[in-house]
Amino acid sequence: MPRFLNGWLTDVVQASLSRPKIEKVRDRPIFSLKKSIISAKNSGLNPIIAEYKRRSPSGINVDINIIEYVKFMENNGATGISVLTEEKFFNGSYNDLELVAKNVKLPILMKDFVVSEKQIDSAYNIGADVILLIAKILTERELVSLYKYAKSYGLEAIVEISDEEDLDVALRGNYDFIGVNARNLESLEVSLDRTKKLLQMIPKDRLKIAESGISTRQDIEELRASGADAFLIGTSLLKDQNKIKELI
């Protein structure tokens, strides 16, 4: 069982533990997010992971065509696609992930509260290339174990942090990426200043992804100056898809 949690995180973890494994034969190759980010950076672009979510703490509640959205992002230079699959609080689904996997040739992140191996089985089977492991909801032993399990499939993993305690845990492992979430998962408050501070504490040889609260070119430039290698953006792109042309 994941570490002791409070409030809505307890509910979301319990819901995650009870989700069934999706039995399906994967029908797409694995696309590397790491290679995609490095390629974008070498081309002088801002590597943007465009996120699709139906609902979130930011207040967004969208019903736009998922296939049209992700193909627009792919055609306009997105480095990867993130798909929210958590059901209870974000109204996501594995079906959303499957739709994206069938329609883009970009690395796909299954954005969820991963706490069990069967969720990783499902991610691989459906067609994800990357999973999210949130340090805040896992013990360090669980984090290491789930990371190794994901790697056994050839998947990449983002270890997400939101404070210095999480950062200490993330730096003890040789993980593919460290994602810095501007949103505090307990209070749901967003602080890009905290993101910048944490980014500056991460060694330069680690690939770092800034997550949440990003809406302007200036946000990206400031985060990049603090050490971010890539930017996971959802709400602002869902509200205005053309914004990717400005941010890229």
Curated annotation (Swiss-Prot):
<keyword id="KW-0210">Decarboxylase</keyword>
<dbReference type="Pfam" id="PF00218">
    <property type="entry name" value="IGPS"/>
</dbReference>
<protein>
    <recommendedName>
        <fullName>Indole-3-glycerol phosphate synthase</fullName>
        <ecNumber>4.1.1.48</ecNumber>
    </recommendedName>
</protein>
<dbReference type="InterPro" id="IPR013785">
    <property type="entry name" value="Aldolase_TIM"/>
</dbReference>
<dbReference type="GO" id="GO:0004640">
    <property type="term" value="F:phosphoribosylanthranilate isomerase activity"/>
</dbReference>
<comment type="similarity">
    <text>Belongs to the TrpC family.</text>
</comment>
<comment type="pathway">
    <text>Amino-acid biosynthesis; L-tryptophan biosynthesis; L-tryptophan from chorismate: step 4/5.</text>
</comment>
<dbReference type="InterPro" id="IPR011060">
    <property type="entry name" value="RibuloseP-bd_barrel"/>
</dbReference>
<dbReference type="InterPro" id="IPR013798">
    <property type="entry name" value="Indole-3-glycerol_P_synth_dom"/>
</dbReference>
<keyword id="KW-0028">Amino-acid biosynthesis</keyword>
<keyword id="KW-0456">Lyase</keyword>
<dbReference type="InterPro" id="IPR001468">
    <property type="entry name" value="Indole-3-GlycerolPSynthase_CS"/>
</dbReference>
<dbReference type="InterPro" id="IPR045186">
    <property type="entry name" value="Indole-3-glycerol_P_synth"/>
</dbReference>
<dbReference type="GO" id="GO:0004425">
    <property type="term" value="F:indole-3-glycerol-phosphate synthase activity"/>
</dbReference>
<keyword id="KW-0822">Tryptophan biosynthesis</keyword>
<dbReference type="GO" id="GO:0000162">
    <property type="term" value="P:L-tryptophan biosynthetic process"/>
</dbReference>
<keyword id="KW-0057">Aromatic amino acid biosynthesis</keyword>
